[in-house]
């Protein structure tokens, strides 16, 4: 029952804050889909709390940098198509290897940052704030849901004791 309570509370806060994120993204001229990738990175990161927020942020940003390396590197010799493929393979390898460092240990976050950059056509000045604000929304979604679940459980325990 406790697991369902937590899931329901996270679903409620995620639903509310997702709607708010959509409005904020449009109001600020950000990429709403990239923000949802930021949210997803936090939810998917095995570490929670501020540590998970920081690790997710570092990996998302490293992914942005790696994508730019691929894009700029491939553009150096656009007539040599194979260069882009080789560069992508080498960079993907490095994206995984960097996970030996704690702050870069969430490999999916690195790939999410890279994918957002590719989808955003390399416009990192738009992609980075979209990912970052989305990441903060993801943190708020999950942690406000956990707070709501704890508060609800505490209220139920007080009610059960008083009966």
Q: At which residue positions do the language-model features occur?
A:
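Hydrophobic faces of alpha-helical transmembrane segments in multi-pass integral membrane proteins
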Residues: 9-21, 54, 58-70, 87-95, ...
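Short, amphipathic, aromatic/basic-enriched membrane-interface segments that mark the entry/exit
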Residues: 1-7, 23-28, 50-58, 75-80, ...
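Amphipathic alpha-helical interaction elements
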Residues: 45-46, 62, 78
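Structural signature of hydrophobic alpha-helical transmembrane segments
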Residues: 22-36, 71-89
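Membrane-interfacial segments
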Residues: 28-29, 74-82, 102-107, 144-156
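Interhelical loops and loop-helix junctions of multi-pass membrane transporters/channels
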Residues: 3, 7, 11, 79-82, ...
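Pore- and pathway-forming membrane helices of multi-pass small-molecule/ion transporters and channels
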Residues: 30-47, 89-123
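Alpha-helical transmembrane segments and their membrane-interface boundaries
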Residues: 1-48, 123, 127-128, 137-149, ...
């Amino acid at each position: 029952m406790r697991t369902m309570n937590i899931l329901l509370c996270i679903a409620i806060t995620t639903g509310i804050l997702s709607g708010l994120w959509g409005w904020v993204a449009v109001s600020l001229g950000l990429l709403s889909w990239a923000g949802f990738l930021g949210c997803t990175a936090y939810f998917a990161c095995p570490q929670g709390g501020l540590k998970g927020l920081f690790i997710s942020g570092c990996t998302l940003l490293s992914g942005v940098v790696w994508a730019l390396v691929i894009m700029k590197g491939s553009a150096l010799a656009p007539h040599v198509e194979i260069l882009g493929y080789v560069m992508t393979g080498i960079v993907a390898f490095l994206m995984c290897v960097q996970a030996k460092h704690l702050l870069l240990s969430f490999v999916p976050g690195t790939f999410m940052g890279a994918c957002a950059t590719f989808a955003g056509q390399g416009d990192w000045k738009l992609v980075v704030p979209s990912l970052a604000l989305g990441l903060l929304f993801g943190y708020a979604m999950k942690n406000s849901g956990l707070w709501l679940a704890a508060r609800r459980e505490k209220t139920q325990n007080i009610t059960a004791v008083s009966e």
